[in-house]
Amino acid sequence: MKRFMQIWKPAVVGFLLLTLVCGVIYPGVVTIIAGAAFQDKANGSIIEGKLADGETGKYGSTEIGQTFTQPEYLIGRAASDGAATNLNPTSEEQKQLVEKRITWWHKLDPANNRVIPMDLVTASASGVDPDISEAAAAYQVDRISRERGISTKVVKEIIAENTSKRLLGFWGEPTVNVLQVNVALDSLKM
């Protein structure tokens, strides 16, 4: 029994010590630092404001794509709806999904005869991308303007205000945050 305790005591003490350090102390310290240094991001980048019913509430997170399908809103990338988003670009299933989405866009805005930007008919890898390209936002300006009864200039200004530029001026592409644009559009009528 003594030999058993000599072998197992260091293992159990080591296990408990590592559990305390790695499972409690380290995550606690990192959470406190993140909460203090990056308060908005550490709490999910939640947008709060006046909702349509006049109450103050939470719209959603700027980091997770929201589903908007009403014509008066800027509409984001196609949601994955729990399906695989890593389909082969040449697969028949992917082709059918894209054709279905193209048909949906034409029904939503029959007056728009421009080419639909690729990111509006394909899902992102995560399926919850909060941003779209500037081309995808520009494609929707006339419809939003018409549906809300506001000028295209106002819609373009709101989109420009909610566009992230290239990282370091050259890395990546500018993107438009769909939720931030829609919150700004809704704030116009309040």
Swiss-Prot record:
Protein topology in the membrane: Single-pass membrane protein
Domain of life (superkingdom): Bacteria
Primary location: membrane
Keyword Cell membrane assigned: yes
GO molecular function: ATP binding; P-type potassium transmembrane transporter activity
Protein function: Part of the high-affinity ATP-driven potassium transport (or Kdp) system, which catalyzes the hydrolysis of ATP coupled with the electrogenic transport of potassium into the cytoplasm. This subunit acts as a catalytic chaperone that increases the ATP-binding affinity of the ATP-hydrolyzing subunit KdpB by the formation of a transient KdpB/KdpC/ATP ternary complex.
Family affiliation: Belongs to the KdpC family.
UniProt name for this protein: Potassium-transporting ATPase KdpC subunit
InterPro entries: KdpC
